[in-house]
């Protein structure tokens, strides 16, 4: 095996589904917790050896979350990368990370991101401001290209969210296959 073959050595996931806003956890703390879990999952101490910290953009106001994380995990000299918004960013950054490891440009990369959308929505409805760490600065690099998310035709009709678009895709697939609603539902459910 090529010694530069990229390998995922640890994973961590944090879920914060409490309905109590007092128990809401802000995204940067969830990211740090997930990285701690990933390090434990790997079975070795490795976070301080990270060469690049990569954070997927979320709905938060942090300037350089990757830099903040690098400092907290003890790899102050690590490259810091952020992304633009986009559902494809996790896969795009994972792909890039693997290629850079394979090419010898990176040794150990952490990839993280977090949202507290449910807590944020609940807080907005209740007129409550959730605690948020102020993180200034800018990552060494921001990856991704910001293209218009919606066509003018969609915008004119108020179609702005994935939950509004994907049903149209599903109906187009169903129609193209000549399937009834029941047949399409059964086929999709088997996937």
PLM region spans:
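Conserved "HGTGT" condensation-loop signature of ketosynthase/thiolase-family condensing enzymes
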Residues: 1-83, 99-106, 110-191
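Blade-loop segments of beta-propeller domains
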Residues: 86
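Conserved phosphate-binding catalytic cores of ATP/NTP-utilizing and phosphoryl-transfer enzymes
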Residues: 91-99
